[in-house]
Amino acid sequence: MAQGSHQIDFQVLHDLRQKFPEVPEVVVSRCMLQNNNNLDACCAVLSQESTRYLYGEGDLNFSDDSGISGLRNHMTSLNLDLQSQNIYHHGREGSRMNGSRTLTHSISDGQLQGGQSNSELFQQEPQTAPAQVPQGFNVFGMSSSSGASNSAPHLGFHLGSKGTSSLSQQTPRFNPIMVTLAPNIQTGRNTPTSLHIHGVPPPVLNSPQGNSIYIRPYITTPGGTTRQTQQHSGWVSQFNPMNPQQVYQPSQPGPWTTCPASNPLSHTSSQQPNQQGHQTSHVYMPISSPTTSQPPTIHSSGSSQSSAHSQYNIQNISTGPRKNQIEIKLEPPQRNNSSKLRSSGPRTSSTSSSVNSQTLNRNQPTVYIAASPPNTDELMSRSQPKVYISANAATGDEQVMRNQPTLFISTNSGASAASRNMSGQVSMGPAFIHHHPPKSRAIGNNSATSPRVVVTQPNTKYTFKITVSPNKPPAVSPGVVSPTFELTNLLNHPDHYVETENIQHLTDPTLAHVDRISETRKLSMGSDDAAYTQALLVHQKARMERLQRELEIQKKKLDKLKSEVNEMENNLTRRRLKRSNSISQIPSLEEMQQLRSCNRQLQIDIDCLTKEIDLFQARGPHFNPSAIHNFYDNIGFVGPVPPKPKDQRSIIKTPKTQDTEDDEGAQWNCTACTFLNHPALIRCEQCEMPRHF
């Protein structure tokens, strides 16, 4: 983890390291401390710092921290050193963190041949991160001459020479693998941005050629014709048997950075390289986008003592998640005891300015990625808009070109090669593979062994993986396609869909009828990758339809809720209006007094009716109120009602009681029920009515 303070959030640090693998950890830690572990702020700052470290402009000399003194820009470390007999052992350990090794070159291999003048090389490139190499050696591990030494801020190499006497003693051990990039391939969303080469096969027994990888430029002349850079005897890399793998890896942010390939000198090898086992190296070759209209020009020089100097910007060399890459894997040949591989004799270096005079050995595995094959002018004009990959190289021999197992990536499908232009964009979509095995024929006592090209598509995003194996049959292995992998030709698009980039098709460069291959045959060549991708797209399409149905249901619910809300708002508005109208209709004070008097009168009537009902219930069922015309007239009758005469004693007692009543006072009659009460009572004995009401 980071050697930062205790204030660093390690979860945020892990997320930032995953998102920006090219930025050193100390820079991420410092950014987190400055922004108080704010993820958004750190992402905004690191997105700007990421560009600097991608293109080698970041400051990697952390002299203040001894714990990270070995930390260097992992973009500048290339895995080419396979043996322990290396010049630079500290660089190998310093760059082991990214799974690669330092780009070195053995002293015993000899220096590169300086066949070109210093003033006629590539154009000036921006400064890059300094490569940490020993003093006196350049980035390729070769001793620099005292006349033209590299400056520290530039990542370049110096092409020195030892003289003509050393040239005659050196042995050309070459089996070049050439990667040609067209400068007018437009960049797009699916354009590959780096080239991943796992390794090159070790030298074949009794073969005077070694193995190397060149990048050739395409020079666009003012007349509009495209030609390949002329091959000369300069920039020849030598290999000893113990370090057979060497890759030149230049790249520019402007035009397509290329390194001129050259034929070996006219010498035969009396040495036999030691047989090497299966060795794998990982080299990421960045592919820069053509932003400038002037590609680098390369000229020849007759002097073998002339030195050359070039600066290279090695960028985007990462072992993290790789996207937008072209991955090429070269496997060593499986030796057969019954077959004896021989070289086809010495070859002379081409000093003319024509590509037609160049002839390469037939058993050299060559990989081309270009807008037009490096063949004759007729062949170039016929297949100019094609981006093709060839497993064998015979750039000057059209007859041998037919017998090569080649793979073409065509930028425009369905049209004739003569009518195509160079404006087609390279889209790393699903490639349809069309492989033609070579026609085996013997030339004298030599038997040509052609490597096989296996094109696969791994699970990295927008990756085109090419495996070159000399003795294996061609096959296409299925790869896991990322869910964000964009396809343009497997499913039917809607009518309003506009295709922005063309699909690459792998066809044969030498056969004219390949352009008229039916779409069914192309789809059959897609193998499991296309089938898996199509199944994935069908699954995604079904999922999209299901989500659309759910969206429609949710939209209907939303409309229903909106209608209910509108109705409730209307009801509320009506109630408010009604309330305001009722407030305006308040009665006046006179009307309220009249209503109060009416209510009082009604209450009196109710009380009278209630009392009549009570009186009816007290008189019994024989009481007939209708027979009494004036009921209230009899209320004021004074005098007792004489009882019925029963016997004598009742007659005698009656006057006595009356006397006593006279003594106490007269009885008072109730005004409500006409009951005669005792004079001492203040309320009626029957109805509880007050005496003086």
From Swiss-Prot:
Zinc finger map (RanBP2-type): 663-693
Xref: InterPro entries: CUE (IPR003892), TAB2/3_CUE (IPR041911), Znf_RanBP2 (IPR001876), Znf_RanBP2_sf (IPR036443)
Asymmetric dimethylarginine modifications at: 173
Record field: transmembrane: none
GO molecular function terms attached to this record: K63-linked polyubiquitin modification-dependent protein binding; molecular adaptor activity; ubiquitin binding; zinc ion binding
One GO CC term on file: nucleoplasm
Keyword Iron carried by entry: no
SMART domains: CUE, ZnF_RBZ
Phosphoserine, modified sites: 372, 450, 482, 524, 582
Placement of covalent cross-link Glycyl lysine isopeptide (Lys-Gly) (interchain with G-Cter in ubiquitin): 611
Subcellular location(s) of the protein: Membrane; Endosome membrane; Lysosome membrane; Cytoplasm, Cytosol
Positions carrying (Microbial infection) S-methylcysteine: 673
Domain CUE: 8-51
Membrane topology: Peripheral membrane protein
Effect of residue 673 to L/M: Abolished Cys methylation and ability to bind 'Lys-63'-linked ubiquitin
Region of interest: Interaction with polyubiquitin: 675-685
SUPFAM superfamilies listed in its UniProt record: Ran binding protein zinc finger-like (SSF90209)
Biased composition, class Polar residues, residue ranges: 97-130, 232-282
Region (Disordered): 91-130, 219-310, 330-381, 642-663
Notes on the domains: The RanBP2-type zinc finger (NZF) mediates binding to two consecutive 'Lys-63'-linked ubiquitins.
Assembly and binders: Interacts with MAP3K7 and TRAF6. Identified in the TRIKA2 complex composed of MAP3K7, TAB1 and TAB2. Binds 'Lys-63'-linked polyubiquitin chains. Interacts with NCOR1 and HDAC3 to form a ternary complex. Interacts (via C-terminal) with NUMBL (via PTB domain). Interacts (via the C-terminus) with DYNC2I2 (via WD domains). Interacts with RBCK1. Interacts with TRIM5. Interacts with TRIM38 (via B30.2/SPRY domain), leading to its translocation to lysosomes and degradation. Interacts with ASB1; this interaction promotes TAB2 stability.
Disorder this protein is connected to according to its UniProt record: Congenital heart defects, multiple types, 2: A disease characterized by congenital developmental abnormalities involving structures of the heart. CHTD2 patients have left ventricular outflow tract obstruction, subaortic stenosis, residual aortic regurgitation, atrial fibrillation, bicuspid aortic valve and aortic dilation.
Function according to Swiss-Prot or TrEMBL: Adapter required to activate the JNK and NF-kappa-B signaling pathways through the specific recognition of 'Lys-63'-linked polyubiquitin chains by its RanBP2-type zinc finger (NZF). Acts as an adapter linking MAP3K7/TAK1 and TRAF6 to 'Lys-63'-linked polyubiquitin chains.
Protein name: TGF-beta-activated kinase 1 and MAP3K7-binding protein 2
Source organism (scientific name): Homo sapiens (Human)
Gene that specifies this protein: TAB2
